[in-house]
Amino acid sequence: MPSRTHIVCLHEGAKGRSIDPVFINALLKALKPAWAQLWKGSNVVRTVPCGGRSNLIAQMPGELRNCLAMGADTTLMVWADLDDDMEDGEKLKERFWTTAKQEGITKEQFEQVVFVFAKDRLENWIEFLLTGKTDESREGPRLKHNEPVARAAKELAERCRSGAADSGFPSSLAWSCRNWRALRDRMKK
């Protein structure tokens, strides 16, 4: 049974202190992307805690080079929070591009990265997915247990699989879903 990383997910936060890996793993397991063979016990998804946003931005070019060197269908996903200083995902993506370009990453290589940016935090998405509402102008409530995190991720996967329109989604969730769909469409080619 092959065991190979197909999706590398960089995220903010410290190991053991972030809900991001729980949400990421539950979401990707439930989505079952066709290009990532999710065998039982395989490590096709690798989450990498990067601390704060500056560290995440600095680490991304090296991880992208690693993914490109692995070849095949290895995908780099970057999960981050859109804090008060970032209006939308495109502005934060531009900060990543500035650093990547300085590190010798081409635009074509950069465009292979899937960016997933939650405003104000991932907890806002979880609040929306579990209750149907959230206010992205404030931080969503902190979560102490993994069960609601995994349940929200599975709810999002179900909406993605069913092709449910993302109207009504918080703006950052709709933006991130479009990025996922672009990856999915690219992998079908």
Name each region found by the language model.
Residues 1-6, 18-48, 54-189:
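C-terminal accessory helical subdomains adjacent to catalytic cores in phosphodiester-
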Residues 9-12:
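Short hydrophobic beta-strand that contains or immediately precedes a catalytic carboxylate
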